[in-house]
Structure formats: structure tokens, C-alpha cells
């Protein structure tokens, strides 16, 4: 995956942390239709005082088999979250459901 040119060192560090978490997890392409519960993310945002410049991120993306549960959520810079989520989607969109994925890297 790629850093955005305009990302700050802090944003790049957040992307690195996310990438490491994905590499350390057992990730598999997963159909996410109907698996996202907006109430859970809204509750997590409120209960954990996530600032407005951050999204509630699934550390292991739902599209990679992560659970839609508070244990898999944290605050992440909006630009980092949305960019990495889209990049992951683009990388896996043509893979068959159930494809096991390995190491994720940033460049």
C-alpha cells in the first residue's frame, strides 16, 4: 500500500501501525454485506471520545475478516483510514472469497 504524499509523519506512523496489525493477523477476503453495524461504531466513538479528525477504524478491516466488535476498533486519522480501506479494497476486489492474505507493506 502507499502513503499519500501530503501525509504528515504522524499519519505515516499511523499507517505503519495499521499495516503491521494487518500483517500480524490472519486475514482473509470476506464479504462484508450486512456485517457493518453503525450503532457499534457510534457507541465506540462516544464511549472512547474519538476526536472529529479521526474515524472509528476496524483494526482488522471487515473486508479482511475482522470482527465488527469494540475489541477490533480504535481511532484512526480519517485520511489514513479512508485511503488504506480503499487501497485494500482495490487490492482484493478481484480475488475469490476466502482468499488468505499475507504480509501488508507500506511504500
Each model region followed by its residue ranges:
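Nuclease and nuclease-like effector domains acting on nucleic acids or nucleotide cofactors
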Residues: 1-107
Amino acid at each position: 500500500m502507499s502513503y499519500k504524499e501530503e501525509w504528515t509523519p504522524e499519519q505515516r506512523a499511523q499507517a505503519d501501525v495499521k499495516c503491521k496489525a494487518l500483517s500480524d493477523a490472519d486475514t482473509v477476503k470476506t464479504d462484508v454485506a450486512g456485517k457493518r453495524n453503525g450503532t457499534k461504531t457510534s457507541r465506540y466513538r462516544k464511549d472512547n471520545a474519538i476526536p472529529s479528525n479521526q474515524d472509528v477504524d476496524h483494526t482488522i478491516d471487515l473486508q479482511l475478516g475482522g470482527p465488527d466488535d469494540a475489541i477490533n476498533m480504535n481511532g484512526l486519522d480519517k485520511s489514513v483510514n479512508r485511503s488504506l480501506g480503499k487501497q485494500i479494497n482495490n487490492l482484493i476486489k478481484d480475488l475469490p472469497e476466502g482468499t488468505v492474505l499475507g504480509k501488508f507493506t507500506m511504500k
